[in-house]
Amino acid sequence: MTINASNIENSFSKINSHFSKLTDYIWPIKRNEISKFLFITLLMFCILFIQNLIRALKDSIVTTMIGAETISFLKFWGVMPSAFLITVMYVKLVNRMKAENIFYLIISIFLIFFALFAYVIFPNHEILHLRPVTVHNLTTSLPNLKWFILLLSKWSFSLFYIIAELWPNVVFALLFWQFVNNITTVEESKRFYPLFGLLSQTGIYLAGHFLENLSKINYYITDKFALQSSFHTLSIQIILTIVLILGIVSIKTFWLLNHKVLDKKHMSLLRFKTKNKSITIAKSFQMILSSRHIRLIATLLICYGIAINLVEGPWKAAATKIYKTPTEYAAFIGSYLSYTGVFTIFFVLLGSNIVRRIGWFTSAVITPSIVFITGILFFAFNNFEGFAGLIIANFILTDPALVAITIGAIQNVLSKSSKYTLFDSTKEMAYVPLEPEIKISGKAAADVIGTKLGKSGSAFLQSLIFIILPSSSYQSISICLMIIFILTCLTWIWATKELNKEYKNSIKFSQK
């Protein structure tokens, strides 16, 4: 039997070819792109780790120390005006400062506030807030305004919630993605964007695991250094100290990207200014209204915000019945975040292949489909809690209220994990083929205002009900919320289909 050398060579060639394809399938990053990719991933990791810590902390403070119903008031009456103000400031800064300096300025403002809250404001909140007797007298005499009175009486908690709510959309959605979109081509975005989350989204799991063990960390530090501060004050200081450290790391990483990693071609893109240096916020909104592409992206963000907020309100209200202190609630949120991190990694691996192999639309429509299906399950159980509780009690020896919280948690885990990967990636890909002027001003308004309009629109409806009917609860208005939820999800799916057409047309136009 003779061995043909050419056949052996062909066999090895085929093996190498298949191995190369497998490697590209799993890790599509080219060798000369590794440093750029990893530094962006590190920056994303730090920003998202901070985002998850302050998100859990703001909910823990407000829901347990003011009341879950106040969240809807804060989102509309506090977060919404702040989002508009930030948009005005950003558009003006774009025409006056380098993109790099804008990043440093805004990040520094956030970090300074978090430091003040941790070490000055919260330890002295009893002195800074109105006395409980005064608050009680005011709420008794003005029952329809009781939630506004509570928010103003505990102004520092309300302010922290507003600032923490702005972080995801100002720092992550606007500053981070604006930077990445300017240094990434359409071809790179198809390989980079889905995989950014593979390493950076582990921050969700680690943040959750950290919060789950917050009590143990608290006890260890108290015993080690013989501290006399209150348990909850120390917990908040621990969380915000980690936030400050990661904030400094993110600033340093951003500096390295600008001065050590990116080449001159990328740096010239970052110094981009709009052709009209005196562009106003009115012109920015006019640009959005005249661009169907941007309008559809804003519609996706609005629908996501409304849909998630309609489910989160009743879920958080139910959770406070079991988890009554900020530390307990933070541990609960930590557990939820840990599962979100695991599922996020799964969706990252799935999403990377879907975007590259199947296309933009399939990836983009998965998130609204998941939100719709799981949301319907939650509302179905919530609206028929008594009947469902009897059935579950016969098969599962547990508290029906805990089952309701678990179903809501599953809904949030699946919705958020798909949002962080598939939704965010496809949304950012939709910006890439647009002209630079629309990318900057259009993205600023669409991301910040579009996101907050979604959350605040739903929040306004809920707060209005609580003002008109002070005795109403999330349980009593659940069916009404479910109907709005269904209509919102159907609109979301329609907008995704239409944006797919615009995205394809924009790519064809940009390649001419």
Curated annotation (Swiss-Prot):
Its main location: membrane. NCBIfam families: AAA. Provides the rickettsial cell with host ATP in exchange for rickettsial ADP. This is an obligate exchange system. This energy acquiring activity is an important component of rickettsial parasitism. Belongs to the ADP/ATP translocase tlc family. GO terms for molecular function: ATP binding; ATP:ADP antiporter activity. The gene is tlcD. It is found in: Cell membrane. Keywords: ATP-binding, Cell membrane, Membrane, Nucleotide-binding, Transmembrane, Transmembrane helix, Transport. It comes from Rickettsia typhi (strain ATCC VR-144 / Wilmington). GO terms for cellular component: plasma membrane. The chain crosses the membrane at residues 34-54, 71-91, 102-122, 157-177, 192-212, 231-251, 296-316, 330-350, 361-381, 390-410, 448-468, 476-496. It is a multi-pass membrane protein. This is ADP,ATP carrier protein 4.
